[in-house]
Amino acid sequence: MPVVHCSSNLPITPYIYERLVYFIKASSISSCISDNLLLVNKTFNDGGCPPHINFCNDEIINPTAGQTVVELVLNAKKGELGSGYLAVDHGKKVVILAFRGSTTRQDWFSDFEIYPVNYSPLCVKEYRKLIEEGKIRECEGCKMHRGFLRFTETLGMDVFKKMESILESFPEYRIVVTGHSLGAALASLAGIELKIRGFDPLVLTFATPKIFNSEMKQWVDELFETDAIEKESILKDEIQFRKGYFRVVHTGDYIPMVPPFYHPAGLEMFINKVGLPQNAEDIEYRGKNNRLTLKDGFREGMSGLVEDWLHVYEHRAYFIDVVGCSGL
């Protein structure tokens, strides 16, 4: 596959394209949690995830399926938010924390609780220590989407303890936190908590709704060193993709454009082709240059219930058709 240069003159390399496709598939299988089809302490191709999913059992499609172990499954209880799973791909030397998109009634309810509330991290002790040591500044005036902040109320410490245990055994492994739509918003918040606890994850989200006010957007970009990663990428003419906060957005998908009074953080990659398949030449690296507007996301003649709008083709078509616990 040739290296494709974007309008920003930064290339979408075969490595980056492969990573994007791999992690949207890893994100998508989180939908199988609803049917209790992800099993702990098993590899993907040995019952860890459903055999009807090619990504789980076909080593041509996923060569490291037999080396990827499901370590923890987060199944949100009634009234809670945040189903997902933690897995380790020993072939790629990566720890994956993936969150499920909107599935339950509570998920839908949280999607629409859009009024802003004051941000407060889960890891308050670690947060205060970083401020006292001068490593980060306090997130003054920071507000975010109420529905998604509910996640910090239900995200248990089990995830962090398990991750610490894994990285003690495999200190050279990288962390990737990922999700689609609601799962992308939760991945963003989990990534912030991991940074506060001293980890250095790559947060890679797909179809992320806007969740931060302007003050928090700036603070999140500082936390993830967005400016430094952007500058280094331009200097080296190569996207630095081992850590930081990256958002993948699809043309015609209006979810990343709402709510209009919030702001996106991180570095953007834009899929400019509507239909599948989408290849490297269909991806534009935009970085911090967010050019999306709300009107760009709506098609003429679009009608129906809001829940129908959230499942339009453009919102699902991110290298694969992201819809339920499907074949991938």
Swiss-Prot record:
GO molecular function: triacylglycerol lipase activity
Gene3D superfamilies: alpha/beta hydrolase
Enzyme superclass (EC): hydrolase
Entry keyword annotation includes Hydrolase: yes
Coiled coil: none
Catalytic activity of the protein: a triacylglycerol + H2O = a diacylglycerol + a fatty acid + H(+)
Keywords recorded for this protein, A-Z: Hydrolase, Lipid degradation, Lipid metabolism
The keyword Oxidoreductase is annotated on this UniProt entry: no
EC number: 3.1.1.3
Annotated active site: 181 (nucleophile), 253 (charge relay system), 315 (charge relay system)
GO biological process: lipid catabolic process
Function: Lipases catalyze the hydrolysis of the ester bond of tri-, di- and monoglycerides of long-chain fatty acids into fatty acids and glycerol.
Family to which this protein belongs: Belongs to the AB hydrolase superfamily. Lipase family.
Protein name: Putative lipase LIH1
Originating organism: Saccharomyces cerevisiae (strain ATCC 204508 / S288c)
